[in-house]
């Protein structure tokens, strides 16, 4: 609903003609729109711009650019998590007594999550390299630290290359009756170390680690890999916040000084003719503002990066 009269009086139409005498009826007039809730209905209130329109658009664009960096990172992370859950769900399905084993599906899901994990890291690093080149070396250290600290991360990094060029990642799938629960079977998905070490793949420094270990439980490996990627996701978000926090605070102060509030805004476009005779005939373009800045910090609070304080 638009809070404006659908039919204007002759006096109102005369006022529009006088105000926009320099415009033709086909010219577009832009106004500021604000969405407000009233009795559970979202209304669009249309007003004049409180400041220079171009200044408001510039602020919106800056918020949008920052928001997209966080959002793209979140999308890539969710893709990885989705692949992990698909793999774990398949493993649970295989535990059903009458469910047949399928080595093809197991390896397909495993290869998906190995690829999406690497894709997540590659995307994050490329985004920083493109937008914040001077900070890339510091950012890359986050990935290097995780590689050094987590066997699951560095092993899966190499296992992904192995599965692309040499062979399937999971070499053994065992299923036996669960004598505690007659309706379930016990599933074991193994990455056998002899299978890896006897292949043509160059494991480099990782070879000694593999030799020192028993065969690797694929399910436990995936869970540890997910933890490692989740740690990286948090560290990447911290890094982005350190880059953008001061600018976000300044943008927030500017919007508050302009008298804008924590609501959704847009640019409303109408021809001069429609403004006079059909004011509800509009097109809108979103303007990012305080609510969108808040949304960035809300997500960061959800993943434990910041703590929000209610000032009320």
PLM region spans:
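Acidic, Ser/Thr/Gly/Pro-rich intrinsically disordered interaction regions
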Residues: 2-107, 138-312
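Short, hydrophobic, well-ordered secondary-structure elements
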Residues: 105-128, 157, 161-164
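Inter-helical turn/loop segments and adjacent helix faces that build the functional surface
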Residues: 127-139
């Amino acid at each position: 609903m638009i809070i404006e009269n659908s039919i204007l009086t002759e006096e109102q139409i005369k006022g529009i003609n006088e105000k926009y005498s320099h415009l033709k009826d086909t010219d577009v007039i832009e106004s500021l729109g604000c969405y407000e809730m009233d009795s559970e209905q979202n209304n669009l209130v249309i007003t004049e711009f409180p400041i220079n329109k171009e200044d408001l658009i510039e602020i919106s664009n800056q918020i949008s650019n920052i928001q997209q960096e966080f959002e793209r990172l979140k999308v890539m992370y969710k893709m990885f998590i989705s692949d992990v859950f698909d793999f774990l769900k398949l493993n649970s399905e295989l535990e059903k007594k009458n469910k047949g084993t399928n080595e093809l599906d197991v390896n397909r899901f495993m290869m998906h999550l190995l690829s999406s994990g690497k894709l997540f890291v590659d995307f994050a690093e490329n985004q920083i390299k493109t937008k914040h080149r001077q900070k890339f070396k510091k950012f890359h250290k986050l990935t290097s630290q995780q590689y050094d600290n987590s066997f699951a991360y560095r092993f899966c990094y190499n296992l992904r290359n192995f599965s692309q060029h040499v062979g399937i990642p999971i070499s053994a799938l065992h299923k036996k009756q669960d004598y505690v629960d007659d309706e379930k079977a016990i599933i074991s998905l193994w990455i056998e170390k002899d299978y890896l070490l006897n292949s043509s793949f160059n494991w480099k420094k990782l070879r000694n680690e593999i030799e020192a270990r028993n065969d690797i439980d694929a399910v436990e490996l995936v869970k540890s890999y997910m933890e490692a990627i989740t740690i990286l996701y948090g560290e990447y978000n911290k890094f982005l916040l350190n880059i953008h926090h001061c600018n976000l605070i300044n943008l927030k102060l500017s919007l508050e000084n302009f008298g804008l509030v924590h609501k959704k805004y847009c640019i409303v476009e109408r021809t001069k003719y429609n403004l006079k005779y059909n004011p509800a005939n509009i097109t809108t373009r979103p303007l990012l503002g305080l609510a969108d800045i808040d949304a960035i910090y809300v997500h960061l609070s959800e993943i434990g990066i910041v703590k929000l304080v209610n000032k009320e």
